[in-house]
Amino acid sequence: MPADRIITREQLACMLLPLADPALRWEGYDDEDCGDALRIAVGNGFLAPENRTGPEGHVSGAHAEVHAKGHVSGAHAYDHAPRLMPDGHVTRQEMATVAMQACGVNYRNASSTMPVCADAALVNNNYGTNVARALYFGFMSLEPDGCFKPRRPVTIGEAAGILNRVADFAGI
């Protein structure tokens, strides 16, 4: 699989499986065809069930690639019951949360913060602390222009690199 392709939630879940407790699985209703890896990744808190679709939320990997190239306009967010969305893409701000959940650092009582980057205003509040920490720990980095690009879909190569840095940090 090419490293520059956008990673799907199912593919990322498969990469996370060695770090997960298989007894923890998402038992919510979902009529989508997905593998056990995604249910386990959600059950372990690495990924969250999604309830949005559209360019600002989660869409199929093919649609995300079109969006990343700038061929989609307008915001089309629709509310749905939480779903696993195995073919949905993973944004950089979500990947920051995955990295922090997987690294083994307990920061439950830590204060919240927002990242220091040129586009900090684009980082959703619920992801801000994880983005700041993923940057601090070196799991992720800013673009050359000083932006984090929180809503840009993550590629397979990026996800592998981030998880390798997390594994090195955690001694795995």
Q: Predicted segments — roles?
A:
Residues D119, V131-A134, A159:
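Interaction-mediating elements
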